[in-house]
């Protein structure tokens, strides 16, 4: 009986010994759970690589911010709104981070940066998820919209970029409202001061132009008086010639000849006058109106005399046009009704300055 009891105790001890060993082994393996995961799920040639980059408690805190998407060989993260790509370079098997600009950088720039950092890269290409190569002109912004892969020499690295926030229509409306408020605040604080400063500036420019125009105005006044005298003389001379014609026709009709003879003569005289008026229209492209004829003669005489005394009419007209624009703008700024309106929305458009095209057209016909 005692022998049986001793045998049972020995068997029980032998039964407990491997269980105790297993317990100790399990406790030893629990000290490194990452290593346990590598032993059970990874092949032997990746064991050393995984042990080199096993995460610690501090790395866990960092991973909360970086959040790699496709493992440790390559991943994309956003730092201060800008994408940063971390890639393991093949030559020294080191991680290298590249800061990318979504709009100004493209795929060609990314590949050039990879080759510049590692001279051992012979072939590099970017492939989309359908296996089609992406052109070098594709922007980084478009590239990061979907998953892709980078082929470096004989390795293919898959990348799943994190989703980024895009601008929506509602956010644009909010930005527009903020801009309106800022514009109203700027107008309330600065428009009055700006208009006063602009008014003083226009007044100074107008004063300078008037000082420059003063001697030219005197010469132009002399030329205008001379042209007016010539035009007035031509007007009265035309009336005198018509009176002489009337007297000659009357003399020939009632004294020298009879009406039967002079009737066809007066007809041809009248028809000749009509032909002269039509010839005037063919030359000037304007109807023969007394006021237009007088103005045309005045302009011709003025330009002819200005050329004789070397008066620069083009420069004078340019100064007058600038002066008219300054006066118009100054009047518009000082008008309380039109103070905050642009030039094409003013309520009073009287006495607007002539444009350069209108001046050229008028000069062409005169």
From Swiss-Prot:
Reaction equations catalysed: Ca(2+)(in) = Ca(2+)(out)
Mode of membrane association: Multi-pass membrane protein
Key word Nucleotide-binding present: no
Pfam families: MCU
Keywords from the UniProt entry: Calcium, Calcium channel, Calcium transport, Coiled coil, Ion channel, Ion transport, Membrane, Mitochondrion, Mitochondrion inner membrane, Transit peptide, Transmembrane, Transmembrane helix, Transport
Segments on the Mitochondrial intermembrane face: 256-264
Coiled coil, from the record: 197-226, 313-335
Main location: mitochondrion
Consequence of changing residue 288 to S: Abolished calcium uptake
Polar residues compositional bias, start-end: 346-355
Homology family: Belongs to the MCU (TC 1.A.77) family.
Domain text: The selectivity filter, in which calcium ions are arranged in single file, is composed of two acidic rings separated by one helical turn along the central axis of the channel pore.
Protein name: Calcium uniporter protein, mitochondrial
Source organism per UniProt: Drosophila melanogaster
């Amino acid at each position: 009986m005692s022998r049986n009891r001793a045998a049972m105790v020995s068997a029980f001890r032998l039964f407990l010994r491997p269980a105790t060993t297993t317990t100790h082994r399990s406790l030893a393996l629990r000290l490194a759970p990452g290593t346990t995961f590598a032993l059970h799920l990874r092949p032997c040639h990746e064991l050393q690589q995984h042990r080199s980059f096993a995460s610690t408690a501090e790395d866990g805190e960092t991973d909360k911010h970086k959040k790699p998407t496709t493992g440790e060989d390559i991943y994309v993260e956003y730092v201060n709104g800008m994408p940063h790509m971390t890639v393991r370079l093949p030559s020294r098997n080191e991680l290298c981070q590249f800061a990318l600009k979504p709009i100004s950088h493209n795929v060609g720039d990314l590949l050039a940066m990879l080759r510049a950092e590692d001279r051992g890269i012979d072939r590099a290409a970017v492939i989309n998820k359908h296996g089609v190569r992406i052109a070098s002109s594709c922007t980084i912004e478009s590239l990061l919209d979907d998953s892709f892969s980078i082929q470096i020499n004989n390795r293919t690295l898959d990348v799943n970029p994190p989703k980024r926030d895009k601008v929506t229509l509602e956010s644009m409306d909010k930005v527009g409202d903020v801009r309106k408020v800022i514009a109203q605040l700027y107008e309330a604080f600065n428009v009055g001061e700006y208009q006063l400063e602009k008014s003083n500036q226009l007044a100074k420019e107008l004063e300078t132009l008037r000082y420059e125009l003063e001697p030219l105005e005197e010469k132009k006044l002399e030329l205008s008086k001379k042209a007016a005298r010539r035009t007035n003389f031509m007007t009265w001379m035309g009336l005198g010639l018509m009176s002489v014609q009337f007297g000659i026709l009357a003399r020939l009709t009632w004294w020298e000849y009879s009406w039967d003879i002079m009737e066809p003569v007066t007809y041809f005289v009248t028809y000749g006058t009509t032909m002269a008026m039509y010839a005037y229209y063919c030359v000037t492209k304007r109807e023969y109106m007394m006021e237009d004829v007088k103005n045309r003669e005045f302009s011709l005489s003025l330009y002819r005399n200005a050329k004789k005394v070397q008066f620069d009419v083009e420069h004078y007209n340019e100064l007058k046009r600038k002066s008219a624009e300054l006066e118009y703008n100054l009047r518009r700024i000082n008008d309380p009704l039109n103070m905050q309106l642009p030039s094409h929305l003013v309520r009073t458009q009287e006495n607007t300055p002539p444009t350069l095209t209108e001046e050229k057209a008028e000069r062409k016909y005169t």
